[in-house]
Amino acid sequence: MRKERCRIGVVAPASRMAPEVAERVPAVARSLYPDRTPEIVFHPQCLAAHGHFAGDDETRAQAFLDIANDESYDAVWFARGGYGSCRVVEAVMCKLTEPSRRKAYIGYSDAGVLLAALYRSGFETVAHGPVAQDILRDGGDAAVGRALAWMVDRSPEALEPTVSRLKLTAAFNMTVLSQLLGTPLQPDLDGHVLMLEEVGEAMYRIDRSLFHITSNAEIRRVAGVMLGRCSGIIPNEPDFGMNEEEIARYWCQRSGIPWLGRADIGHDTNNKIVPFGTSHERC
């Protein structure tokens, strides 16, 4: 049955969220949904600080569980990326209860660690898409609006344009996926179109990540690879001699994985939403 008001919980399993996000995101929600404004609850942990992280490992794990296991929430929205999800994922996954399976989960970058684990464990409504802190970037209102459109209505307009004609999809930051391969968290992507994006890496590192990804026997069973945007590329000295698309094509050819072109995803506010598996109707 359609709910009149969606309830969204925001958590930060990696790095600390900027305080102003908690004011600006609800303002966007009110402007987009004046008659059925989603309730957006920022867990206090989002503003905690413990060195690099938004609270220590136990605090971050418990915050995720507080929202995920609470049946009153419809969605879990990652506050931001950064780093730290790998330190809490195993503690989280073994304590999730039945209400957690009825929620939507959305984020990208470091959040890919938890998204992968959820998808591997059979969670059906998981997506690579904007985080709450994207509101602070140029064009952030549009990114937040896109995430809300997916969480509230499963809007097809929020999706990466090719998703609607593909049977199975998944998307990751390539460094995050590379580091998941060979661990108990590696998801089964057999038959999926795999979309990859990157930020802040030199070309040789992109090359190395794609070597590792495309060398994995299970990844070689994907339906194909699409490359999103690779932004903030660090200069290579000497010049690497290939751009990111040439590198991706090279490793696809060497590994026998079909190259399927470019994807409209990236570490930016134009980042479109890619559901894991099939796109799902609104809860």
Language model features with spans:
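Short, acidic/small-residue loops that bind anionic groups at enzyme active sites
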Residues: 94-117, 125-131, 254, 258-260
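ATP/NTP phosphate-donor binding region
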Residues: 1-72
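Internal helical hairpin/lid segments
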Residues: 188-237
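Charged helix-capping and loop-helix junction motifs
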Residues: 25, 56-61, 208-213, 239-247
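Glycine-rich, charge-decorated loop segments at or immediately adjacent to ligand/cofactor-binding or catalytic sites
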Residues: 112-123, 268-275
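Short Gly/Thr/Asp-enriched flexible loops that form oxyanion-binding sites at enzyme active sites
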Residues: 81-100, 119
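Conserved anion/nucleotide-ligand pocket segment
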Residues: 123-182
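ATP/nucleoside-binding phosphotransfer catalytic cores, i.e., glycine-rich phosphate-binding loops
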Residues: 229-283
